[in-house]
Amino acid sequence: MKIISPVLSNLVFSRSIKVLLCLLWIGYSQGTTHVLRFGGIFEYVESGPMGAEELAFRFAVNTINRNRTLLPNTTLTYDTQKINLYDSFEASKKACDQLSLGVAAIFGPSHSSSANAVQSICNALGVPHIQTRWKHQVSDNKDSFYVSLYPDFSSLSRAILDLVQFFKWKTVTVVYDDSTGLIRLQELIKAPSRYNLRLKIRQLPADTKDAKPLLKEMKRGKEFHVIFDCSHEMAAGILKQALAMGMMTEYYHYIFTTLDLFALDVEPYRYSGVNMTGFRILNTENTQVSSIIEKWSMERLQAPPKPDSGLLDGFMTTDAALMYDAVHVVSVAVQQFPQMTVSSLQCNRHKPWRFGTRFMSLIKEAHWEGLTGRITFNKTNGLRTDFDLDVISLKEEGLEKIGTWDPASGLNMTESQKGKPANITDSLSNRSLIVTTILEEPYVLFKKSDKPLYGNDRFEGYCIDLLRELSTILGFTYEIRLVEDGKYGAQDDVNGQWNGMVRELIDHKADLAVAPLAITYVREKVIDFSKPFMTLGISILYRKPNGTNPGVFSFLNPLSPDIWMYILLAYLGVSCVLFVIARFSPYEWYNPHPCNPDSDVVENNFTLLNSFWFGVGALMQQGSELMPKALSTRIVGGIWWFFTLIIISSYTANLAAFLTVERMESPIDSADDLAKQTKIEYGAVEDGATMTFFKKSKISTYDKMWAFMSSRRQSVLVKSNEEGIQRVLTSDYAFLMESTTIEFVTQRNCNLTQIGGLIDSKGYGVGTPMGSPYRDKITIAILQLQEEGKLHMMKEKWWRGNGCPEEESKEASALGVQNIGGIFIVLAAGLVLSVFVAVGEFLYKSKKNAQLEKRSFCSAMVEELRMSLKCQRRLKHKPQAPVIVKTEEVINMHTFNDRRLPGKETMA
């Protein structure tokens, strides 16, 4: 057996101990976790010992420590301090206390004045300062140890502006809580100059939660589009007060800038019809996010709200979610910087933390998908640059997502998954509406019944049937109320106030105006109209004219004055042509002594007077002793006889009608006739669309008519159509009213008639308050009724009456050129033909005479023409063949003639 020396044993034992200690140190070193402290500074809250942000801060640190996924070798601890609100001195003191303990980052506080004090210290000592609420940021902040997880309000302001543009608002009221609200909404406040937007800015009361005086002013000013910049707690109180004041109706639309709108209890408002829109940054569609929020709710870490606060219990607010994400973002930077250690820092020594700059850079470079979506920062100013907002809106099921917004793509409105409209008031189903109307036959009238009737059953008429059809299509119920002052609606020239149904729509006393309410420009400026359900125009209602007996000279009436003038001209023309042709035609000259065929004298009976006599005899159908002999003159005579036959026959036929019927003569035939006289008074319904038309018209005729009506306002303007109709029946009065009503009245009163055509063109529409969500639905329903033909059927039902007997025309129309102008053409053609025939006869006879007299054709023609043109002579010598005699006989003949001719001596 070998013996080991004691010295060697001690050496081996010593080495074994060293190896064991080294192994133990290595094992200890590998199993040791790094401890890192975060600091949190939070304000005291009234609801409990800890606010939502502090609870979320602790909840996030504990979650990271439990999971060990993000920081497997690091254990986080925290130091939280409480300060009073707005106490920046205390905030600075607490920050210095935490820095002396050694913290890697400071979270909070939330209020801007306290946060600025803490940030100043963190900048000096190089410690990251993490914010989760909005704080006004200076433009140059590149060296700041600061990041904010709250979305930049310049982006939020653009999101709100995009919503305003999407809803097509023209007027907006901005209500803010404190002065920082004006800074946050700078993009919106600058919008009026660029987007033609009228902006009104109001501030909530500072020392009280009572917003009723402000809401009362807004209600009086009819401010229906409102943007509230306030906390969700204050928003809940405002909604409760608005409900009590009747401002939670479909005409109001509220946009809230708070990202905690989903935390409000909206159960009392679901069926009110109010439009409520806001944004949400919590990514609730992510399953991991939903599980964390559910765990938060189950652990009930947050103190429950007060019973009357209007807030939901168990919801993680946006501030809490942002604080939860802030802790995780800083932890991501810690994971990337394992060699980082914290050290105690003293505020009075101004010695910065040596790892601060690197750690701050890692925080700004960090990326994290948290409860509030993607988180990235601007490396220069530390602001959050990438985020998504859900657009949420109140529906009957509660607040639902209707779209998204992000800084890059802007607003993207999406349809509801259930296929429901984005706005709650787009649906009229099961809604109860107040309908204002006016008694106007046949549109609205009391139903005749032996039993007493109540409610809507009291009324019937065209508009009542229309309202019933609209109710069936859209599914709403209604209550009919007669307008209090019995007027349609007109604006007072002095104070600009409206009356009638228009006023009730402006004041939201009624939801619809279903009546014969004309769509006009001035009304469209204060209320909205649907598409017209009836098209019409202004016309004149007047008594039917009395009949008059034929006058002394009524025998002239069968032919128009133009025809009488043309007949006279035709008579003169035919007579002259007959005279000329008769003298021109050789065959119209005859031997006046038939017993002496050797006579060289011929005669022409168609002198100028005889030609006129021939025409008169034919025209009077009496004939004359003159008979044309030549073909040309016979053509003239025949055409003239044919002409007189047609004229006399037409005259005789039309004369019977003129002498046997009464003539209906109206003193006016158009609006121009009314304007040119003052004997017949005329007017319209006071404060109606017809009166407004004449009042606003720039056309000279209508302006003159309005001057007449306004000068006799008390006597010519009536209160209703019924009064105007009675005045027409009982006095010399013309009533200006809508053509459809005139059509209805004249069907039932045969003593009335419409004078002239339409003065203008317009339509009746269903009136709604300005900006009403019901208008488009009403319009679509009206178009549907029009396509189905139901509007026409309803009009036939109410306009068709017993009717007046069909009246035959009580005044025959005088025959004009368009009736018998053709006979003048035939007459002219006959005259032209006769001229050509006469020329032919003349040439033919001249040729024969030239051959007979052994002379040239031209000389014979000239001689014949010379004799024909001597209009004063009825006789001329007949041409004879030349006779050859001896000279002595000629001398003897001249001697004989000289003895018989008188004046021989004078001539010699």
Swiss-Prot record:
<feature type="binding site">
    <location>
        <position position="523"/>
    </location>
    <ligand>
        <name>L-glutamate</name>
    </ligand>
</feature>
<dbReference type="GO" id="GO:0043525">
    <property type="term" value="P:positive regulation of neuron apoptotic process"/>
</dbReference>
<dbReference type="GO" id="GO:0032839">
    <property type="term" value="C:dendrite cytoplasm"/>
</dbReference>
<dbReference type="GO" id="GO:0051967">
    <property type="term" value="P:negative regulation of synaptic transmission, glutamatergic"/>
</dbReference>
<dbReference type="InterPro" id="IPR001828">
    <property type="entry name" value="ANF_lig-bd_rcpt"/>
</dbReference>
<feature type="transmembrane region" description="Helical">
    <location>
        <begin position="639"/>
        <end position="659"/>
    </location>
</feature>
<feature type="modified residue" description="Phosphoserine; by PKC">
    <location>
        <position position="868"/>
    </location>
</feature>
<dbReference type="GO" id="GO:0097471">
    <property type="term" value="C:mossy fiber rosette"/>
</dbReference>
<dbReference type="GO" id="GO:0045211">
    <property type="term" value="C:postsynaptic membrane"/>
</dbReference>
<dbReference type="GO" id="GO:0097110">
    <property type="term" value="F:scaffold protein binding"/>
</dbReference>
<dbReference type="GO" id="GO:0043025">
    <property type="term" value="C:neuronal cell body"/>
</dbReference>
<keyword id="KW-1017">Isopeptide bond</keyword>
<dbReference type="GO" id="GO:0005886">
    <property type="term" value="C:plasma membrane"/>
</dbReference>
<comment type="function">
    <text>Ionotropic glutamate receptor that functions as a cation-permeable ligand-gated ion channel, gated by L-glutamate and the glutamatergic agonist kainic acid. L-glutamate acts as an excitatory neurotransmitter at many synapses in the central nervous system. Binding of the excitatory neurotransmitter L-glutamate induces a conformation change, leading to the opening of the cation channel, and thereby converts the chemical signal to an electrical impulse. The receptor then desensitizes rapidly and enters a transient inactive state, characterized by the presence of bound agonist.</text>
</comment>
<dbReference type="GO" id="GO:0050804">
    <property type="term" value="P:modulation of chemical synaptic transmission"/>
</dbReference>
<feature type="topological domain" description="Cytoplasmic">
    <location>
        <begin position="583"/>
        <end position="638"/>
    </location>
</feature>
<dbReference type="Pfam" id="PF01094">
    <property type="entry name" value="ANF_receptor"/>
</dbReference>
<dbReference type="GO" id="GO:0045202">
    <property type="term" value="C:synapse"/>
</dbReference>
<dbReference type="GO" id="GO:0004970">
    <property type="term" value="F:glutamate-gated receptor activity"/>
</dbReference>
<comment type="function">
    <text>Independent of its ionotropic glutamate receptor activity, acts as a thermoreceptor conferring sensitivity to cold temperatures. Functions in dorsal root ganglion neurons.</text>
</comment>
<feature type="binding site">
    <location>
        <position position="689"/>
    </location>
    <ligand>
        <name>L-glutamate</name>
    </ligand>
</feature>
<dbReference type="GO" id="GO:0014069">
    <property type="term" value="C:postsynaptic density"/>
</dbReference>
<dbReference type="Pfam" id="PF00060">
    <property type="entry name" value="Lig_chan"/>
</dbReference>
<dbReference type="GO" id="GO:0006874">
    <property type="term" value="P:intracellular calcium ion homeostasis"/>
</dbReference>
<keyword id="KW-0675">Receptor</keyword>
<dbReference type="GO" id="GO:0030425">
    <property type="term" value="C:dendrite"/>
</dbReference>
<dbReference type="GO" id="GO:0031624">
    <property type="term" value="F:ubiquitin conjugating enzyme binding"/>
</dbReference>
<feature type="binding site">
    <location>
        <position position="690"/>
    </location>
    <ligand>
        <name>L-glutamate</name>
    </ligand>
</feature>
<keyword id="KW-0407">Ion channel</keyword>
<dbReference type="GO" id="GO:0060079">
    <property type="term" value="P:excitatory postsynaptic potential"/>
</dbReference>
<dbReference type="GO" id="GO:0098686">
    <property type="term" value="C:hippocampal mossy fiber to CA3 synapse"/>
</dbReference>
<dbReference type="GO" id="GO:0015277">
    <property type="term" value="F:kainate selective glutamate receptor activity"/>
</dbReference>
<keyword id="KW-1015">Disulfide bond</keyword>
<feature type="topological domain" description="Extracellular">
    <location>
        <begin position="32"/>
        <end position="561"/>
    </location>
</feature>
<feature type="topological domain" description="Extracellular">
    <location>
        <begin position="660"/>
        <end position="819"/>
    </location>
</feature>
<feature type="glycosylation site" description="N-linked (GlcNAc...) asparagine">
    <location>
        <position position="430"/>
    </location>
</feature>
<dbReference type="GO" id="GO:0043113">
    <property type="term" value="P:receptor clustering"/>
</dbReference>
<dbReference type="GO" id="GO:0031625">
    <property type="term" value="F:ubiquitin protein ligase binding"/>
</dbReference>
<dbReference type="GO" id="GO:0008066">
    <property type="term" value="F:glutamate receptor activity"/>
</dbReference>
<keyword id="KW-0812">Transmembrane</keyword>
<dbReference type="InterPro" id="IPR028082">
    <property type="entry name" value="Peripla_BP_I"/>
</dbReference>
<dbReference type="GO" id="GO:0001662">
    <property type="term" value="P:behavioral fear response"/>
</dbReference>
